[in-house]
């Protein structure tokens, strides 16, 4: 049987110091973790041309990983015909506008029905690209723009841009509280020691920087623009809670509603607009195109739920 080859260079950002099996699950998300671990044990995984069969091998970053396999029966993430809202597409990249509720890639609680499954259906060769071309992710209930690489060349270029903080990503959100001025939150973020699905600010965490400025103020809320300098999991949500202005509707980091009038206003919004997600939208992305080397940018207007809430708050 002809061997199938998969290869990728390990990025430094977010990968250095992690176990081999963890690295593979991030680079080759189209395959299940059990499948990847089996390939390691079966001597099908090479690091810089040498066999590595220890799943707990620590990876430094920068290594070339190659997988050879003839076992086509191992479980993989299946292609699924899921519609994607395409903003821009050429032979190198894809820009999509993700709706709230759509998961980026399979994981605990969401085994399918994800953007990754949609990409596998839409592009038959994308499984050979690490992470199926997914450069960055958005939380399940955060809407907005994402960039997908359609070639290994584009993937490596875009990952490098992301590492060097050359991809500009902006968001809009509605926060609870009347913010006085914009500013910068520069505080490390790490996994919460007890609530494993949550992140938290901690001096032992990874460097995390969020820029924010006010778009409009209301009686009990503020419409805010954010720019990410780093891209940690739940970064904007955690940083806003840290400074006392949690995102409206956030089920994990929403904070406590204080004051009778304040509580009543939030309850009215939740009921009237059926808001069960954080009011956060990735509305702008800009980077140098990996092939043409031209600066390109895209914008996506707010989803209807956030538009309706802002109209309500203006009254």
From Swiss-Prot:
It is an enzyme of class 5 (isomerase). InterPro entries: PsdUridine_synth_cat_dom_sf (IPR020103), PsdUridine_synth_RluA-like_CS (IPR006224), PsdUridine_synth_RluC/D (IPR006225), PsdUridine_synth_RsuA/RluA (IPR006145), RluA_PseudoU_synthase (IPR050188), S4_RNA-bd (IPR002942), S4_RNA-bd_sf (IPR036986). It holds the Pfam family PseudoU_synth_2. GO terms for cellular component: cytoplasm. Keywords: Cytoplasm, Isomerase, RNA-binding, rRNA processing. One of its GO terms (molecular function) is RNA binding. CDD domains: PseudoU_synth_RluA_like, S4. It is found in: Cytoplasm. Its main location: cytoplasm. It comes from the Bacteria. The active site is at residue 139. Its EC number is 5.4.99.23. Residues 18-87 form the S4 RNA-binding domain. It catalyses: uridine(1911/1915/1917) in 23S rRNA = pseudouridine(1911/1915/1917) in 23S rRNA. Gene3D superfamilies: Pseudouridine synthase, RNA-binding S4 domain. GO terms for biological process: enzyme-directed rRNA pseudouridine synthesis. Responsible for synthesis of pseudouridine from uracil at positions 1911, 1915 and 1917 in 23S ribosomal RNA. Belongs to the pseudouridine synthase RluA family. PANTHER family: MITOCHONDRIAL RNA PSEUDOURIDINE SYNTHASE, RIBOSOMAL LARGE SUBUNIT PSEUDOURIDINE SYNTHASE D. This is Ribosomal large subunit pseudouridine synthase D. It comes from Buchnera aphidicola subsp. Schizaphis graminum (strain Sg).
């Amino acid at each position: 049987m002809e061997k199938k080859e998969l290869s990728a260079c390990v990025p430094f950002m977010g990968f250095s110091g992690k176990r081999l099996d963890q690295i593979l699950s991030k680079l080759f998300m189209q395959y299940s973790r059990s499948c990847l671990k089996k390939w390691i044990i079966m001597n099908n995984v090479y690091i810089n041309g040498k066999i590595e069969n220890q799943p707990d091998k620590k990876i430094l970053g920068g290594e070339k990983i190659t997988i050879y396999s003839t076992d086509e029966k191992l479980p993989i993430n299946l292609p699924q015909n899921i519609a994607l809202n395409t903003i821009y597409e050429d032979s190198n990249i894809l820009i999509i506008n993700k709706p709230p509720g759509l998961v980026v890639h399979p994981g605990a609680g969401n085994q399918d029905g994800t953007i990754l499954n949609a990409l596998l259906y839409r592009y038959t060769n994308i499984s050979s690209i690490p992470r199926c071309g997914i450069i960055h992710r958005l939380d399940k209930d955060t809407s907005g723009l994402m960039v997908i690489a359609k070639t290994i060349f584009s993937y490596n270029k875009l990952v490098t841009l992301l590492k060097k903080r050359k991809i500009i990503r902006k968001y809009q959100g509605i926060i609870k509280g009347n913010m006085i001025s914009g500013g910068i939150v520069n505080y490390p973020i790490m996994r919460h020691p007890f609530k494993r699905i949550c992140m938290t600010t901690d001096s032992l965490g990874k460097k995390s920087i969020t820029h924010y400025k006010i778009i409009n103020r209301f009686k009990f809320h503020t419409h805010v623009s954010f720019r990410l300098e780093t891209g940690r999991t739940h970064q904007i949500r955690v940083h806003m809670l840290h400074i006392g202005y949690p995102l409206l509707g956030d089920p994990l980091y929403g904070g406590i509603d204080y004051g009778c009038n304040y509580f009543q206003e939030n309850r009215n919004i939740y009921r009237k607009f059926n808001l069960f997600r954080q009011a956060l939208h990735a509305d702008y992305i800009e980077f140098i195109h990996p092939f043409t080397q031209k600066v390109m940018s895209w914008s996506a207007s707010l989803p209807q739920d956030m538009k309706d809430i802002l109209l309500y708050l203006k009254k």
